[in-house]
Amino acid sequence: MFADLQGLGLTPQEINKVAYHRQNLGNPFINQEGKPMTIYATGIEIPEGKNKGKFVSVPGYVGGRIVTDEDQLYNIWKKDIQSGKWPVYETADQLNARDAWLHQIMDKDMAQYFEQQRLKQPYQQMESLFYQDPFLTIK
């Protein structure tokens, strides 16, 4: 269903983020603008351990809700961070650049997924101020 990730230069940890996103496509968080969110990637500075002072990108969409507190996110994902599940970068700029690339991949996934869902739905007339389907108005 989705594009193959090979050849895109992703690390195994970045692929884990795309997999997390793909798992949540069927149940995204809908933000205030009505847009679906599947991961809410959040960069946090690692406060302890071998990667202390480096930056990790973790999902902020957890358990059907958005978590923005960095300390809370670190506690939620601590074991996964320490085990190397999520990508770690030397600087926040490196993290932001890679997340921007991953976001492009995820945006393509989302567009493809929702287009497929739209095609599965029965025909529904879209409302328009300028057009009305004449076949639906005949009585």
Spans of model-derived segments:
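Charge-dense, intrinsically disordered terminal/linker segments
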Residues: 1-139
